Amino acid sequence: MKVGFFLLKFPLSSETFVLNQITAFIDMGFEVEIVALQKGDTQNTHAAWTKYNLAARTRWLQDEPTGKVAKLRHRASQTLRGIHRKNTWQALNLKRYGAESRNLILSAICGQVVTPLHADVFIAHFGPAGVTAAKLRELGVIRGKIATIFHGIDISSRDVLNHYTPEYQQLFRRGDLMLPISDLWAGRLQKMGCPREKIAVSRMGVDMTRFSPRPVKAPATPLEIISVARLTEKKGLHVAIEACRQLKEQGVAFRYRILGIGPWERRLRTLIEQYQLEDVVEMPGFKPSHEVKAILDDADVFLLPSVTGADGDMEGIPVALMEAMAVGIPVVSTLHSGIPELVEADKSGWLVPENDARALAQRLAAFSQLDTDELAPVIKRAREKVEHDFNQQVINRELASLLQAL
């Protein structure tokens, strides 16, 4: 069986869950091809990118110059190359294909792809990718069934929903399977009109064989706090920094490290400077997986205070939390989106309300006083939860069976 992965951009260092799923299907013995519209960041990559030689497995459909005018010229040129083919003309149907017709994306792809790209099933990560995949299938560019995974921003952001809700409703008809990563998103897809029989919750998970539980350790002095996240609003790192200001005022000894890159980097650095926290808060930027693991080994607590963005953008269920729980690092997060489906408050971790820096500071201060006897049962339940409900190997085998039955 051949499995295709259809992505808008690949690779992206922040989307380790996509990378992990691709390599898992390779490891299970499936023939795997990656089809991506645009080339992502091939410099800041994880070890699996090289180990599995994923560049050789990837077909990029839009190898374009930068700049709006240059892109349109390039697309027009590609469109003209295939103007003698029926599907290139069909791709210019504004009424049927909307913005992707108007901006010449579909016609340019039709112009350059002579032989259809085939897979038994394409897994499209994020709703908009599923929408594009379904259009390209209708145009004969790809051939195979389409299963679309809905993660977070694609089913929560107001801007995305304003644009894509009619497109999603078309996808519910054209696509073969919708795979929300949480029960919350499954309910939302149903409310948007997706037939229940086309929905199956398929969670993101972690490879438990990569995460051996570390010994339970009491919080150190200073308390070692860590976050690993893309630097965006919904990660709530601005709330974490405000909580750090309060912790420092209270005289709590701590060090906080934020690993990741993203559009909010300058804003977060400015906040650190404004609060004069440079001595206790560090932002070392992107780190590959093996370096992140080494830093996590020293952490006392993993912090991810996710919030709903101003545009409505929400998390799915963050894989970073699963990884921390799998290795035995206590987690502090928020009552946000699907996170309570993973973290049971005061049982397998600690949850505070969104956007509540005071509650977050209080929780971290209280955490710093816990001993190993208090931590041990929480850490045990956390790993058991991930092992039972978020075990990547089990999830991927179940997904493979689901796709084979399509």
Residue ranges and their predicted role:
Residues 179, 217-235, 241-244, 302:
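Conserved donor-binding/catalytic core segment of Leloir-type glycosyltransferases
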Residues 267-290:
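Nucleotide-activated donor-binding/catalytic signature segment of Leloir-type glycosyltransferases, i.e.
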Residues 321-326, 330-333, 343:
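Short hydrophobic beta-strand element within catalytic cores of glycosyltransferases
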